[in-house]
């Protein structure tokens, strides 16, 4: 359904003026509340024989931004789809480069998508609600998973302690 979607494939072909597009990866991102923007970043490029499966991400990005490995670079179009609307959670991106003003895709995001080159375009997630009066601090080992009590809620646990609970409808998908 997702990797072979006709409109997404057509958008990828048009974006690169290409004749062939081969879908290869599907990620699903669930985002609970974050009160600050995530860092602006680029995703991980792929080169002939080199991907994040066998090469550190910092090295892949260095290879990409140096321009020295362009002839081995595999062009990738990324389709980011939003399945629901939540408080906040917009997508800020710099299609004209980091020296220009960003654009933002926010509000009314359910069942929308953007197709582009997220391996070469800086982007970031804007704050996602629901917003609390106090920050919820967790470590990098925190996990988001369905609650095991049958409530249908999702919980963020950190070190075995529940730090945040929310219905799935409030999680950015």
Predicted features, each with a name:
Residues 23-25, 37, 74-80, 88, ...:
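Extracellular structured ligand-interaction cores
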Residues 1-72:
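Signature of the catalytic double-stranded beta-helix
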Residues 11, 65, 78, 94, ...:
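Short, hydrophobic/aromatic alpha-helical segments in well-folded domains
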Residues 86-173:
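Catalytic core of Fe(II)/2-oxoglutarate
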Residues 2-10, 77, 109, 119:
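A structural signal for well-ordered alpha-helical segments within the folded catalytic domains
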Residues 44-52, 59-62, 80-85, 139-148:
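A generic short-segment signal for beta-strand/edge and adjacent turn/coil regions
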Residues 30-32, 81-83, 95:
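Short, structured patches in soluble enzyme cores that scaffold and shape functional sites
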Residues 16-19, 84-88:
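Proline-centered turn/helix-capping motifs that create local helix->coil transitions or kinks
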């Amino acid at each position: 359904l997702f990797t072979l979607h006709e409109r997404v494939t057509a958008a990828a072909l048009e974006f690169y003026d290409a004749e062939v597009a081969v879908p290869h990866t599907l990620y699903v991102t669930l985002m609970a509340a974050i009160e600050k923007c995530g860092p602006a970043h680029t995703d991980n490029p792929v080169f002939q024989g080199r991907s994040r499966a066998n090469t550190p991400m910092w090295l892949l990005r260095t290879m990409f931004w140096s321009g020295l490995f362009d002839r081995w670079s595999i062009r990738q179009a990324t389709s980011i789809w939003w399945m629901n609307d939540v408080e906040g959670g917009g997508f800020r991106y710099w299609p004209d480069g980091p020296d220009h003003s960003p654009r933002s895709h926010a509000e009314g995001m359910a069942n929308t998508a953007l197709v582009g080159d997220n391996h070469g375009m800086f982007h970031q997630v804007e704050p996602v609600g629901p917003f609390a009066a106090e920050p919820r601090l967790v470590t990098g080992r925190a996990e988001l998973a369905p609650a095991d009590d049958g409530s249908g809620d999702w919980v963020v646990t950190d070190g075995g302690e529940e730090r945040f609970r929310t219905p799935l409808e409030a999680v950015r998908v």
